Amino acid sequence: MGDAALRAKWDRASRLYDWMTWGDIHRFGPAKRRLCMAMQGRCLMVAAGTGNDFRCFPPGLDIVAIDVSSEMVAQARIKAKAYDGVLEVRQMDICALDYPDGTFDTVVTACTFCSVPDPVRGLRELRRCLKPGGRLLMFEHVRSRIGPIGLLQDLMTPITRRFGPEMNRDTVGNVLRAGFDIEREENVYLDVVRTITARRPDTA
């Protein structure tokens, strides 16, 4: 999928995005808040969508939130006004971040890498923009290691990718391939929804 098609896909999705994700917001909000408690320093949130996860951020931080969709960004900017801290929302592609190397202390993702067309490239770009020792905090849908569930995800993915995520991504493997060290994994729902804490090595 080209860049223009990707933007158009998420522009269309923005119209019903809050309605489609209402259940997840309430179901997974506590897990996201626990993950976000580790945010520190200058922070980047990628694929922010309409900004529903802004409520999970600790107060008083300096945060940039990006999304590829101009329609998502427009809605997210409205929600950003309620944040108790600095929260700038920009339209930007995760695979071409307009920031110098080592800009951020923390990067946050929430259901992001089930949708990025080239996930390893996107993760390498996040690694570039993190300071050495900086942390990547991820809340993601991943492919199950339980055989029947993983197979079901494989069968569902050709359908789900038409309107949003790919359900069978090996996100943990992709994080390692991008050059991160994984510090912690935690299952949130079975092993399909998972939090991952990773770190950019100090010497790389």
Name the predicted role of every residue range.
Residues 1-40, 52-53, 75, 151-158, ...:
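Conserved class I S-adenosyl-L-methionine
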Residues 4, 20-24, 137-195:
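C-terminal alpha-helical "lid/dimerization" subdomain adjacent to the S-adenosyl-L-methionine
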Residues 44-96:
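Class I SAM-dependent methyltransferase SAM/SAH-binding core
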Residues 62, 133-135:
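Short glycine-centered segments of the SAM/dcSAM-binding site in methyltransferase folds
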Residues 95-107:
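A short acidic, Gly/Pro-enriched loop at the edge of an enzyme's catalytic core
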Residues 106-118:
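A short SAM/SAH-binding and catalytic strip from SAM-dependent methyltransferases
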Residues 120-132:
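A short glycine-rich, Lys/Arg-flanked "PGG" loop and its adjoining helix->strand segment in the class I
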Residues 196-204:
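C-terminal lobe and adjacent flexible extensions of AdoMet/dcAdoMet transferase-like proteins
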